[in-house]
Each structure stands twice: as C-alpha cells, then as structure tokens.
Amino acid sequence: MCSSDLTAQQLAEHFAARGVAVNYPGLASSPYHEVAKKQFGNRYGAMLTLRLGTKGKAFDFINHLHYALNVSNIGDARTLVLHPATTIFVHASEEEKAAAGVTDDLVRINVGLEDPEDLLEDFQQALQQI
C-alpha cells in the first residue's frame, strides 16, 4: 500500500474504535469490504467519510483541524476535508443527496502524504473538540 492508503486505513480504524460512523472499504465492518478486497486487493484508497451526528459538529470538526485543508477538490499531496452537503452537493435536491448518501453530518476526508502520527493527533484533537 502507498502511504496515503495506509494512513486512511489507520484513520478509519481510529475513528471506528471511538464509535464514529466511518465509511471506508478497508474496514472489515464495511458492507463493501469483500467486494473491494476482490477488486482492489489490499489497496482500499485514500478517501473515507465520517458521520458526526449534526451539521454543526461536522463544521466544528473541520474548523478545528490544523493539517487538513478545507477544500473541495481531490488529488492533492495534502490531506483535504470537506462538507459535501454544502460544497459539491449544494445544488442537489434533498432526494439527490439522499440517493448519494450525502447527509448534513457527513465529512469527506482525502488523505494526503503527511506523517500518519501527525494526522492521527490532529484528527483526534478535532474530534475531542466537538
């Protein structure tokens, strides 16, 4: 696995162990795990999503991060976070958002190449603030 894949796996496991709802195909608990394992081997990618309970908590979490950038693109060497409901799905209807699994408490994380321990610490401190 490349660095961002490994870090995404670590973050997903870290959040899941703390009771946060995580969508990441590398987790054995994911409904997509077996399909992803067959299709991708042990490379589950560098993107995961979290559900934090409310829109306010999602915003607070994002605003307390120091390393991750709050931007709506992917494909950067840096870790990026965004709130899909108010960025890339801002013009979608409620039905379209629901069909795509986009909720007000959803946060998308695209893991970059930063030190995994730095990211884990940063995400943990942000989680503790909400």
Predicted region positions:
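Conserved small-domain helix->loop->beta segment predominantly found in fold-type I
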Residues: 5-72, 76, 93-98
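PLP-dependent enzyme catalytic core of the Aspartate aminotransferase-like
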Residues: 63, 79-130
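Short, small-residue-biased leader/transition segments that mark boundaries at the very start
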Residues: 1-3
